[in-house]
């Protein structure tokens, strides 16, 4: 079982990119949720435009699926400049980054996703580029090698990461603007899914939007994915319109419950409750009990359950909370 196999995965599934681009907001006025981020970015962008400067470098971090790429696109659109996109793992050599930097136009935005995965060699190239708009290149080899400096046009680097703690201090300190994206409120997700339905030409009632939003784990990417799957159900089993009843039936069929849990979430929680009397249980024992690798539990399954208060990590192991017992209608034995 891997994260990409799950309907409620916050990661990108292979065929979603083109659809996501079509429904993605283009401007801050269309951007829903994250009010503190929206207000701050509106001020920073307006100030940069008034001065005729490039926007300061921006670091965006937070869980996957919350709109880091969307925000980078919006910044480029609001600034009226080009967006060049790449990712940390793709930039294997210093020359890969140098090629992108030397092709930038003044004030362009360079977006590096998964920036925490940059190699140290590539990261070193970024320091003078971000700070002084200069590129240090080594010419030649051995004793004859020499360094030359190339001037770069003023540009904005936007780095995105799900692991801000993995960034080195020198890189993190060079970002003048740092934005953390939080999980979305249900009301915001209702607005997002209603807008997406309109973009896709779907009939979605407010109650249908609510059912989709409340099961989306606070994540717009999951909301939009569930919308597409519920659309399929509505076209085959109903008249094509998505109301509350159709949405509930479709999501129940898809095995996504009222908390946004799928079968893997429930399997883990019930293992702690039934097999280990609510815990504490060590990670290795829990992994063996549900037939998963410990890394899958730690990196994929647990974070949302902990964030929502269904599981607690303690020095002695994992414990199911009263919230978890209540979810399954199980009375906790004292």
From Swiss-Prot:
Catalytic reaction equation(s): ATP + H2O = ADP + phosphate + H(+)
An example Gene Ontology biological process: DNA recombination
Positions with a binding annotation for ATP: 23-24, 65, 68-70, 131-133, 174, 184, 221
Region (Small ATPAse domain (RuvB-S)): 185-255
Location, primary (coarse class): cytoplasm
SUBUNIT field: Homohexamer. Forms an RuvA(8)-RuvB(12)-Holliday junction (HJ) complex. HJ DNA is sandwiched between 2 RuvA tetramers; dsDNA enters through RuvA and exits via RuvB. An RuvB hexamer assembles on each DNA strand where it exits the tetramer. Each RuvB hexamer is contacted by two RuvA subunits (via domain III) on 2 adjacent RuvB subunits; this complex drives branch migration. In the full resolvosome a probable DNA-RuvA(4)-RuvB(12)-RuvC(2) complex forms which resolves the HJ.
Family affiliation: Belongs to the RuvB family.
Domain-level remarks: Has 3 domains, the large (RuvB-L) and small ATPase (RuvB-S) domains and the C-terminal head (RuvB-H) domain. The head domain binds DNA, while the ATPase domains jointly bind ATP, ADP or are empty depending on the state of the subunit in the translocation cycle. During a single DNA translocation step the structure of each domain remains the same, but their relative positions change.
Protein name: Holliday junction branch migration complex subunit RuvB
Source organism per UniProt: Yersinia enterocolitica serotype O:8 / biotype 1B (strain NCTC 13174 / 8081)
Gene label: ruvB
